[in-house]
Amino acid sequence: INQGIVLEKLSTGAIHFHETTKSDIAQACCDLYQQSPENSRVMAPTKALVADINKLTQEAVNPNGNRLEFEMHGERFFQNLRLNDAILFTQNHYDKGIQNGSLGVLTSVDASGEGYGEVTLDTGDKIEVTQAVLDCMELGYAITLHKAQGSQFPRIIIALQKGRIVDRAWLYTAITRAEHEIHIVGTEDDFKAISEAPSHSHRRNSYLAELLKG
């Protein structure tokens, strides 16, 4: 991919291509996620698409979890985050052990003292959900590639949409987030256009050839 070569057979080795119309990409990613929730993460190029996929996926895999609730000025509010949801943190709070892009699971929605519940990070660390922490929490079934930073996941589902930031390097980087299995969801035309067009950034060397041999 990084050399701009499109494979005739789009599902090869550890990479699986799923031909999907633009309007069905979010649902297709949600369906693929459900096949192996504990190993999967969806990568999408825009916050809007991430939000769509997260909403669908929460409804599919965790519709009945108890919602996180908190009190402010004597009133009770519910956050659309449920017990056992995948969680993404969007700001740095080094004093609390989280940074922008940290991932975890909401493992408690029991309020105590200043806290509304608890998130267990992928590292195993437990984070108390205070108001400051809650303000930078969102669903994390799907995330932008930018938020993935250096993280890797056993199984990656890539929502592929042509757009300003999506080029060959973006797709290549998304693929390198996967340890074992990659699912690319989108139209074949978009896949070819993105793969064949010169990248916005410099080429990168990688283990992609090994993945394709699979």
Language model: regions and residue ranges:
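C-terminal accessory regions
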Residues: 2, 53, 100-214
